[in-house]
Amino acid sequence: MIEAIALREHPELCDAAIAYFQATWASDASLMVYDDCIRHSLTTENLLPRWYLLTDDGAIIGCAGLITNDFISRMDLYPWICALYVEKSHRGRALGQRLLARAEADARRAGFSAVYLCTDHIGYYEHYGYTHIGTGYHPWGESSRIYEKKL
């Protein structure tokens, strides 16, 4: 059975989640960013950050996060959905939407009226109700499209 689960509800998966996020998103220089952030997210009383896993009978097949900022210039906007990923072997079945929906629901319950994300993908997020609202700039000199979804 495929499920989108919140890591806060399954802290026993912490090490596996960190390894998955690192393998999927991190460079050698950023390995500890995921380790430190995910570990501390399990014990904070703050609303954010939150991390999610997509599992198929216990095997991790995808991930996402809900964070205060995704290393982008628009720090006036939050929360941000980040690190959305579904294994290639499981794509084409709207499984990414399950992760988006889980993060959106948590943001709504926390009192947020919108969520944001930055990406270079055009067409995917629009399919799930996201609207392109502008461009943001990253500290490493690149830019990304910014999307918003009203909750």
Predicted features by range, described:
Residues 55-57, 149-150:
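Active-site beta-strand termini and strand-to-loop segments that position acidic
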Residues 1-17:
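A short beta-loop-alpha structural element at the N-terminal edge
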Residues 53, 59-69, 80, 85:
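Conserved beta-strand in the GNAT
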Residues 49, 142-146:
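Short hydrophobic/aromatic beta-strand or adjacent loop that forms the aromatic wall/cage
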Residues 109, 113, 119-143:
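Conserved active-site alpha-helix within GNAT-family acetyltransferase domains
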Residues 86, 92-105, 117:
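Conserved acetyl-CoA-binding loop-helix of GNAT-fold acetyltransferases
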Residues 26-53:
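Active-site rim helix/loop that mediates acceptor-substrate recognition in acyltransferases
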